[in-house]
Design a protein with these regions (language model features):
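Active-site glycine-centered loops adjacent to acidic/histidine catalytic or metal-binding residues
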Residues: 16, 43-44, 78-79, 165, ...
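Extended active-site neighborhood of metal-dependent phosphoesterases/phosphodiesterases
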Residues: 1, 53-150, 178-190, 200-219, ...
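Active-site metal-binding motif and surrounding structural segment of the metallo-beta-lactamase
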Residues: 29-49, 189
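Acidic, histidine-bearing metal-coordination/catalytic regions of metal-dependent phosphoesterases
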Residues: 1-13, 18, 25, 29-35, ...
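Acidic-and-aromatic substrate-binding clefts and catalytic sites of carbohydrate-active enzymes
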Residues: 17-22, 47-53, 82-85, 168-173
Length: 253
């Protein structure tokens, strides 16, 4: 980790790869000349894990692709990581701080808050046979948000980035009713999301959002994206590229 007063970094964010190596490889080509400090996989990358071999094979491909042996690599759960026979076993492969799939940390003078939206369907949906309890997970994060947003680390940060898989804006999200009362006043510079398989940029205030929202694309060559975050002193730049290297978004917050 960098020094607490470090004011510059570059990070890469992938999402919704759905275990498609050719999509990952196409996006890697677009960032091959970038010297990045850490990487985030924002959900639905190791989707519907059936068994140990399947899950670890693709997880290894991802970490090797971004040099995870020397570059910090973060995995945020999407709704598809918590489906199928090996979904519980998948958790064992990641070092969740305090055993929680959500949390916050500082990268230099930037605060990064990660949330876990759980499933995109209610717990009583017929698919789950009464075995899911993501309502409790969402409620847990209400207390976490209340504590985090009032913390010294959050308040002192130069920039603040929110990351979670299912968008609160531009998409139905079961977390919105619980979390929005806290987030609508929180001074985040940007929220990075995924899930919809459609790249989108919702400027601050366009959907009642208190911060800009950037949603990554999907799992096919024509809609997959990779995000590049570049923090240089007081400036945070967010770029989004497609599989051909076309710049879909380039904003400074």
């Amino acid at each position: 980790m960098p020094e607490a007063n470090a004011d510059s970094f570059t990070a890469i964010v992938f999402n919704d790869l759905h275990q498609r190596p050719h999509i990952f490889e196409a996006l890697l080509k677009q960032i091959k000349d970038i010297d990045y400090d850490f990487v985030v996989f924002n959900g639905d990358c190791i989707d519907d894990p059936a068994n140990h071999e399947q899950a670890t094979r693709f997880a290894s491909l991802l970490t090797e692709g971004v040099h995870g042996d020397r570059i910090p690599t973060l995995f945020i759960r999407g709704n598809h990581e918590i489906r199928n026979a090996y979904s519980i076993g998948l958790r064992k492969h990641f070092d969740y701080v305090g055993g929680k799939t959500y949390g916050a940390f500082n990268w230099g003078d930037t605060r990064i808050v990660m949330l876990d939206c759980g499933e995109d369907k209610t717990d009583d949906h017929r698919e789950y046979s009464g075995l899911n309890d993501f309502t409790q997970l969402r409620n847990e994060q209400v207390a976490f948000l209340e504590q985090e947003l009032s913390s010294k680390a959050f308040k002192k940060a130069d920039k603040r980035i929110l990351i979670h898989h299912i968008p609160l804006y531009g998409c139905d999200n079961l977390c919105k009713e619980l979390w929005e009362p806290f987030l609508k006043k929180a001074p985040f510079n940007v929220s990075l999301n995924a899930h919809t398989h459609r790249f989108a940029h919702h400027p601050k205030g366009s959907l009642g959002n208190n911060y800009p929202v950037v949603i990554g694309g999907g799992k096919n060559p024509e809609n997959a994206t990779v995000m590049i975050l570049e923090k240089k002193k007081g400036e945070l730049r967010i770029k989004v590229l497609n599989t051909e290297g076309k710049v879909l978004l380039d904003i400074v917050e």
